[in-house]
Amino acid sequence: MILIWLSIFMLVFIMLTLGMFVNKKVSLDREKSSPFECGFDPLNSSRTPFSIRFFVITLIFLIFDVEIYLLLPMVYLNMSSPTTYLIIFFTFILVAGVFYEWSEGALSWIK
């Protein structure tokens, strides 16, 4: 089994090394790197602005989604199980983090 994984690793390594040597070198010019709009300079920036508040709300939602995922199996666990104490400790850390973010003002939408 180890021989199979070693041979796969070596094959991938050889292919990547050969790809680096065979790869056509491309010189980056300003004209080649810029977007093309009918021969004129672009009117707008290609980057769209993104509010960091939406990103923070998304992260908080993701964290508490994982918390719910961990809390659902607690219905079937024995309350004296070490896993139960670990999940309760993890939940306590998450709730303490939310209170800290709230006290710092990161959760207030309008300042």
Curated annotation (Swiss-Prot):
Q: How does it sit in the membrane?
A: Multi-pass membrane protein
Its main subcellular localisation, reduced to a broad class, is mitochondrion
Per UniProt, the enzyme's principal EC class comes to translocase
Q: Which UniProt keywords apply?
A: Electron transport, Membrane, Mitochondrion, NAD, Respiratory chain, Translocase, Transmembrane, Transmembrane helix, Transport, Ubiquinone
Name any one GO molecular function. NADH dehydrogenase (ubiquinone) activity
Localization (cell): Mitochondrion membrane
Its EC number(s): 7.1.1.2
Q: Which superkingdom? A: Eukaryota
InterPro entries from the xrefs? Answer: NADH_UbQ/plastoQ_OxRdtase_su3, NDAH_ubi_oxred_su3_sf
Q: Which reaction does it catalyse?
A: a ubiquinone + NADH + 5 H(+)(in) = a ubiquinol + NAD(+) + 4 H(+)(out)
Entry's transmembrane regions: 2-22, 54-74, 82-102
Cellular component GO terms held in the UniProt record? mitochondrial membrane; NADH dehydrogenase complex
Q: Which family does it belong to?
A: Belongs to the complex I subunit 3 family.
What does this protein do, in the record's words?
Core subunit of the mitochondrial membrane respiratory chain NADH dehydrogenase (Complex I) that is believed to belong to the minimal assembly required for catalysis. Complex I functions in the transfer of electrons from NADH to the respiratory chain. The immediate electron acceptor for the enzyme is believed to be ubiquinone.
Task: Enumerate the PANTHER family for this protein.
Answer: NADH-UBIQUINONE OXIDOREDUCTASE CHAIN 3 (PTHR11058:SF9)
Q: What is this protein called?
A: NADH-ubiquinone oxidoreductase chain 3
Biological classification of the source: Eukaryota, Metazoa, Ecdysozoa, Arthropoda, Crustacea
